[in-house]
């Protein structure tokens, strides 16, 4: 099994409401999350480790992982918010506003590290989750 380790977040993509107002729709995302989803959909045994929130956005992330055949049992569930990334599109180019302070993904610590047995053949890390603390040190310890 390949265990992907890193951020899972909700991309809030711009839409237009029925009244013509600007609105946002939630979509599961994150660089490493998307890698895990792709591997799972290709039928490659895949696990995912991060901090997942027990909020409604965490439910979206877990359902997306489950429906893509990704084992999220290695992930920790925390009673903190999910990271949100609001997206602004201008001429096809995206800019982001991230809301990540004290979120489930960012606040995982070495106490949340999973026991990876012989089933784990490879770990895949990457993206922004390797930088902030305490999650950066947690991934390094894994």
Model-derived regions, located:
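Glycine-rich phosphate/adenosyl-contacting loop at the front of the ribokinase-like
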Residues: 1-70
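Generic recognition of cysteine residues
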Residues: 4-5, 120, 135
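Glycine/Thr-rich phosphate-binding loops of Rossmann-like dinucleotide-binding domains
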Residues: 12, 132-133
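Conserved N-terminal subdomain of the carbohydrate kinase-like
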Residues: 45-128, 132
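A conditional alpha-helix N-cap/helix-loop micro-motif detector
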Residues: 28-29, 106, 135-136
